[in-house]
Amino acid sequence: MINIASFKVLKGYEHWKTVFMDEAFVKRREEAGVKVLAKGFDAQNERVYVIQELDSMEVIQNAMAKNQEKIMEAGVDMSTMQMIPLQD
């Protein structure tokens, strides 16, 4: 399935991207079964968008629960997090 995650960042997009693309964090996502198809920043509404392919929403929920420290380091404002699961 495809999931679109959208959120605001507290430390800026470039900082978020640096943490998100860190080799160890990329490996954690791969091991969890999360494949990132695209990512980007919409300056007009100040939101980051990440398009992911995964088996189920449970996969991303478990991955996020296990990586809360890294998510906080990246500056993700969890109060703005939106997940949109797309089913074919």
Predicted features along the sequence, with ranges:
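Short S/T/G/P-rich N-terminal loop/turn motif that feeds into the first structured element of a domain
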Residues: 1-88
